[in-house]
Amino acid sequence: MESAEPAGQARAAATKLSEAVGAALQEPRRQRRLVLVIVCVALLLDNMLYMVIVPIVPDYIAHMRGGGEGPTRTPEVWEPTLPLPTPANASAYTANTSASPTAAWPAGSALRPRYPTESEDVKIGVLFASKAILQLLVNPLSGPFIDRMSYDVPLLIGLGVMFASTVLFAFAEDYATLFAARSLQGLGSAFADTSGIAMIADKYPEEPERSRALGVALAFISFGSLVAPPFGGILYEFAGKRVPFLVLAAVSLFDALLLLAVAKPFSAAARARANLPVGTPIHRLMLDPYIAVVAGALTTCNIPLAFLEPTIATWMKHTMAASEWEMGMAWLPAFVPHVLGVYLTVRLAARYPHLQWLYGALGLAVIGASSCIVPACRSFAPLVVSLCGLCFGIALVDTALLPTLAFLVDVRHVSVYGSVYAIADISYSVAYALGPIVAGHIVHSLGFEQLSLGMGLANLLYAPVLLLLRNVGLLTRSRSERDVLLDEPPQGLYDAVRLRERPVSGQDGEPRSPPGPFDACEDDYNYYYTRS
């Protein structure tokens, strides 16, 4: 009996704790914050999986070559070709073919990728670009799917696909499997990234809170791109290739379970919430001139990042005789100005929300100036300053224009955000699909200086285009046709007849029949019209 009492008390305590947690999960403000945490973790995972292979894949492909049909070299000496990631948006990496092997790597060098042969260089470039390419192809389909299914189910699908991709990475034994895993990640990102950002825009409809929430999401993207390569390199060195991917797979599974607990995407209430208004088709959104201007700015601002990353390490070695440590550390300090840019834009947007276009234009100008300054740097410190300016400008553009897309949908279309953020994801994917494949060829044919100056000039020329958005803040929120019709008084031969409210089971004790297929639609209307 004495032993039964503590067991009963433990069960009672567990029941009370479960009820308290359940009540907390259903409280609207806490639920909204938990949704933000879930989305931020999903974005963090996507970027960590994107970057964690940077120190692993070149060495892994070289290991495959050593045991396969490819040529072998003795001693095993390579140069680093994939720089450490930038703290801005998820980026693509590729090796550069112009360097030659020099000194042997010291022990414990898994944090720095080995230099592959020329044929492997092409393989790595295609491998890194495959994610963005598939994401680019899937987004025109995932956007309308998200509009139709609401946001939680596509986010759950994206997390599930990312989990499968991560596990496939862990057990990949050949290039074809690596390519399949990388492409599968692009499929998951097309659902998880787009639905996650759209969910934030939907949960935070008011502008100051929306900008702040999207800024937090961008900070998680930045942190994920920064921490993933050292995370992957350390675990790869001391625990093996599979461990970093299995850790990320476990976090992805936990995030999916948390989403199931918080959003309950398959419950009856979730199905009722999913009965959203019909969203504007994605092709019509693409033809909206304001949305087209924003999408062009997002692509333009990310081109310098996507094109400099695969090429700047070799340029540093040839221009300033940079050491391996300097090449690896070049992007690391840029994390601070990127987060600072996000914070500054959020604060300014809260105080002057009608000047979002100006913050984006200033960001493009900073990116253009920084990109033009890069070729003039002849030492490590000025180069770091210019790269910090580049990431600061990208933070200004992203933080200012992502909320602007949601606002444009609110005031000019239907407030359903899947398709518009699919357009934003397409804008990013264009830059990162081209960067790993064509950046090296441009450098070899035209030169690094011409590449940097061209990208800087493109950003400087695009900055005045954002003047077209200067009147966006003066627009008023539109109302859907359904809302207008419901608010109009009956006219002519029609009288308004109020529907009898039906009792709900559990509220008055009376049973009710099972809901029919059209009950959710009927509940949306308070009145119907009938001929008098």
From Swiss-Prot:
Region ranges (Disordered): 502-523
Highest rank taxon of the organism: Eukaryota
Pfam families, A to Z: MFS_1
InterPro entries xrefs: MFS, MFS_dom, MFS_trans_sf, MFS_Vesicular_Transporter
Alphabetically ordered keywords of this record: Congenital myasthenic syndrome, Cytoplasmic vesicle, Disease variant, Glycoprotein, Membrane, Neurotransmitter transport, Synapse, Transmembrane, Transmembrane helix, Transport
Membrane topology term: Multi-pass membrane protein
Cytoplasmic topology ranges: 1-33, 147-152, 204-213, 264-289, 347-356, 410-422, 469-532
Annotated site residues (Important for transporter activity) in this chain: 193, 398
Activity regulation summary: Potently inhibited by L-vesamicol, reserpine and tetrabenazine.
Compartments in which it is found: Cytoplasmic vesicle, Secretory vesicle, Synaptic vesicle membrane
Annotated glycosylation sites: 89, 96
GO molecular function: acetylcholine transmembrane transporter activity; acetylcholine:proton antiporter activity; monoamine:proton antiporter activity
Transmembrane spans: 34-54, 126-146, 153-173, 183-203, 214-234, 243-263, 290-310, 326-346, 357-377, 389-409, 423-443, 448-468
Region annotation (Mediates interaction with SEC14L1) ranges: 471-532
Tissues and organs where the protein is expressed, per its UniProt entry: Peripheral and central cholinergic nervous systems.
Residue ranges, Lumenal, vesicle side: 55-125, 174-182, 235-242, 311-325, 378-388, 444-447
Function recorded in the entry: Electrogenic antiporter that exchanges one cholinergic neurotransmitter, acetylcholine or choline, with two intravesicular protons across the membrane of synaptic vesicles. Uses the electrochemical proton gradient established by the V-type proton-pump ATPase to store neurotransmitters inside the vesicles prior to their release via exocytosis. Determines cholinergic vesicular quantal size at presynaptic nerve terminals in developing neuro-muscular junctions with an impact on motor neuron differentiation and innervation pattern.
Disorder this protein is connected to according to its UniProt record: Myasthenic syndrome, congenital, 21, presynaptic: A form of congenital myasthenic syndrome, a group of disorders characterized by failure of neuromuscular transmission, including pre-synaptic, synaptic, and post-synaptic disorders that are not of autoimmune origin. Clinical features are easy fatigability and muscle weakness. CMS21 is an autosomal recessive, pre-synaptic form characterized by ptosis, ophthalmoplegia, fatigable weakness, apneic crises, and deterioration of symptoms in cold water. Learning difficulties and left ventricular dysfunction may be present in some patients.
Quaternary structure annotation from Swiss-Prot or TrEMBL: Interacts with SEC14L1.
Family membership: Belongs to the major facilitator superfamily. Vesicular transporter family.
Protein's UniProt name: Vesicular acetylcholine transporter
Gene name tied to this protein: SLC18A3
